A protein has these predicted regions:
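Generic structural signal for hydrophobic core residues of well-folded globular domains
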Residues: 34, 150, 294, 322-325, ...
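C-terminal helical "lid" subdomain and adjoining coupling/linker elements of P-loop NTPases
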Residues: 273-280, 293-370, 382
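Short alpha-helical scaffolding segments that buttress acidic/His motifs in well-ordered protein cores
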Residues: 263, 287-291
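Elongated, mostly alpha-helical coiled-coil "stalk/stator" tethers of large membrane protein machines
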Residues: 358-372, 376, 380-383, 390-391, ...
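Conserved ASCE/P-loop NTPase catalytic core
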Residues: 2-257, 268-285, 298-302, 383-508
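Amphipathic alpha-helical interface segments used for dimerization/assembly
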Residues: 59, 82-86, 90, 201, ...
Length: 508
């Protein structure tokens, strides 16, 4: 059907156009997508066997949907992508505020216009991009905002009484007729406002200010909410929850590989940054592991969750930290070093909610310790786990069997390595080669690694040994200091720092 050629109701009737509800429309288009083996929600990763099938079943059942999950779980994005399941264009009565179907008008305006002009009633065509409404639920949202109210100014201008239906000012829901309407953070909506949605969900109609009118609206409702309202702002009233046919539980990425894909897809990295800064797979995994460590930490509020935005923001900050260093040192290109990861601390502190014990430790210390735990966890994936070496009895494990003996002995001899944040790449590499046994260890386990990869892995070994308490590590102003444990008894384990050790300027 060429919608551009159809301008009147008569032409629409002759074309054989058949009205259908938005839920039927989405159902039919979804069936076509499934038959064509197309993903109706492209770009949504990690939900292929859970949330997406649940959503497809709900849409095939013509249900309203509640996405229930912690922050940063793509709930709103799922709703927005439903726009692509709508027909490209639908006809409406020209000038209608609520997108009246020309064949099934419901507003006084459309009914009167069709009664007056008949088949000559003008038709407009509405693109699917205009058939999506979204409202963030806040405590100040009123019934008038959502449903509508009497407009005294309109009544005065048109010289109509308040008993006349034409004095109504429609809210955002009636204006979303024949559209998808999303209410984000549903628990934030006051209980009395939630009650006003009962009729729309159950009967498909609404009443405004006691008017005896019935508007059988055609709307697909999608709601988003947290499973527990961790801010104590409110909750979803039970009768409303009962009227939402499908409740779908979202979740965080279950594997590191999925999380890596999401971060790379969502991170906003410019072409100039991509050319100047190279990021190894090791750095990417360390950043992702921080989120997994945070979700399992006793110091982080599990009711709040740890958003995927944490790793996206951290990834961007890590690249920017390396870029800034390269600009300062006038280097044409560089790579992200582990020392650059100190720059992701602000991304962590701003994305986690701490429990009481975490607040006592302080956000910077908790964030730093999460990074340390990430290094500790990933270290065992690349090199022999020092913990297993510690557990061996001395008679079973000769000193030469410890692959880290030469490195720790170098530090035991009183040597110190100062890894400055703004050191040039070549100077950092020369510094790392001074540590006995460090290059040999990396070469043994990564024979085909490039020179840059070797240098990064050498730095990783130092951080990994510090995370396992084989050497000490202390973050100081402008640098990270590595030395032997006996010489740093006050900083055993490298993860125990006072809040005073962190200066706001160190993270900028």
């Amino acid at each position: 059907m060429d919608s551009k050629k159809i301008k009147t109701l008569g032409e629409l009737k002759k074309s054989g156009y058949i009205s259908k509800s938005i839920k039927q429309e989405i159902r039919e288009n979804l069936i076509k997508r499934i038959q064509a083996k197309e993903n109706p929600f492209p770009g949504i990763l990690g939900y292929e066997d859970s949330v997406i099938p649940d959503t497809e079943r709900a849409l095939l059942s013509k249900h309203n949907i509640l996405f229930l999950g912690l922050r940063g779980q793509a709930k709103t994005r799922m709703a927005r992508q439903m726009i692509d399941l709508l027909d490209e264009y639908i006809p409406i009565v020209a000038g209608s505020e609520i997108n009246d179907d020309p064949l099934q008008p419901i507003s006084r305006y459309a009914i009167d216009l069709i009664a007056e002009q008949g088949d000559k009633t003008p038709i407009a065509w509405l693109h699917r991009s205009q058939r999506y409404g979204e409202k963030l639920a806040t405590p100040d949202v009123s019934v008038a905002d959502l449903i509508g109210d009497i407009d005294p100014i309109k009544a005065a201008n048109l010289k109509l009484s308040f008993a006349d239906e034409r004095v109504l000012h429609y809210g955002i829901i009636p204006r979303s007729n024949r559209s998808i309407f999303v209410i984000n953070e549903l628990p934030d909506l006051q209980a009395r406002i939630q009650v006003s949605l009962f009729n729309i969900l159950e009967e498909g109609d609404l009443q405004i200010r006691g008017f005896k009118l019935r508007l059988p609206l055609d709307v697909l409702f999608v709601f988003t909410a947290n499973p527990e309202d961790y801010t104590n702002r409110g909750s979803i009233v039970t009768p409303l929850k009962d009227r939402i046919e499908s409740q779908i539980l979202t979740h965080y990425p279950k594997t590191l590989e999925t999380a890596l894909e999401i971060t790379e897809q969502e991170a906003d990295i410019s072409e100039a940054q991509q050319e100047k800064v190279k990021v190894s797979d090791l750095i990417k995994r360390l950043i992702e592991q921080v989120a997994f460590e945070a979700r399992g930490s006793e110091l982080v509020d599990k009711k709040s969750g740890v958003s995927a935005r944490l790793t996206i923001s951290a990834y961007e900050n890590a690249i920017s930290a390396a870029e800034r260093r390269a600009i300062i040192n006038e280097e044409k290109e560089t790579q992200v070093w582990l020392s650059d990861l100190i720059g992701i601390i602000p991304s962590i502190t701003g994305k986690i909610e701490l429990v009481y014990e975490g607040e006592q430790e302080g956000p910077y210390l908790v964030a730093f310790n999460l990074l340390e735990r990430s290094i500790r966890t990933q270290f065992g994936q690349y090199f022999p786990n020092p913990d297993t070496l510690k557990k061996k009895k001395s008679k079973e494990a000769a000193p030469e069997e410890n692959p880290y003996k030469a490195i720790t002995r170098w530090f035991d001899a009183g040597n110190t390595l100062n890894n400055y944040f703004e050191t040039k790449d070549e100077d950092k590499v020369q510094l790392l080669y001074k540590v006995d046994g460090l290059h040999a260890l990396v070469k043994k386990h990564f024979k085909s690694a490039s020179d840059k990869e070797n240098a990064l892995l050498m730095e990783f070994v130092l951080h990994g040994l510090a995370a396992h308490s084989l050497i000490s590590k202390k973050v100081m102003e402008g640098k990270i200091e590595f030395k032997d444990l006996m010489g740093s008894m006050l900083n055993i384990g490298s993860a125990h720092f006072s809040e005073e050790d962190f200066n706001e300027e160190d993270f900028n």
